[in-house]
Amino acid sequence: MRTQLAQRKNQRIRITTEIIKITPVKKAKNTIYKLALRNITSTEFTGKVNHLYVSISAASLPKEDLLILETLAKKQKHPKDEKLSFVGTVYEYKYGTGHNLKLNKNNNVIKFNYSLNQIKKLKLVSA
């Protein structure tokens, strides 16, 4: 997996997935949204990806996407401190600026493109 990432550093990947939890974390002048995602589909991934954790900086988002994220965070059924238990492999990605996030207001589906060289940390965790 790591060698594949190194070879395709600049390739952009499209992922479609469903948001199951949003946790806003307020920093000094910014909010970081931590998203827990499931039902991931992508032509680029090999193997089964069950869940994905994404950290997104509010400062790097367009206002319309930020509004959708805030609305979804308020509407969600999970209490913020509830721990989500996952089965299978968990991939954790942290993003800098420059990714392209597209949110669908109706059914909590998120689509985004990112360049692999924007991933600061990749951690595989067995649940």
Give residue ranges: language-model regions:
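Polybasic, proline/glycine-rich intrinsically disordered low-complexity segments
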Residues: 45-46, 51, 83, 123-127
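Short acidic, gly/pro-rich beta-turn/loop elements at beta-sheet edges
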Residues: 27, 47, 96-98
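OB-fold and OB-like beta-barrel modules that bind single-stranded nucleic acids
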Residues: 15-19, 83-91
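Cysteine-centric segments in proteins
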Residues: 2-9, 13, 20, 71-75, ...
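Beta-strand/loop nucleic-acid-binding surfaces
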Residues: 41-78
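Structural detector for short beta-strands of small beta-barrel domains
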Residues: 5-43
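Conserved binding-pocket/active-site segment within a compact domain
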Residues: 46, 78-87, 101, 108
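OB-fold/S1-family single-stranded nucleic acid-binding modules
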Residues: 38-42, 89-127
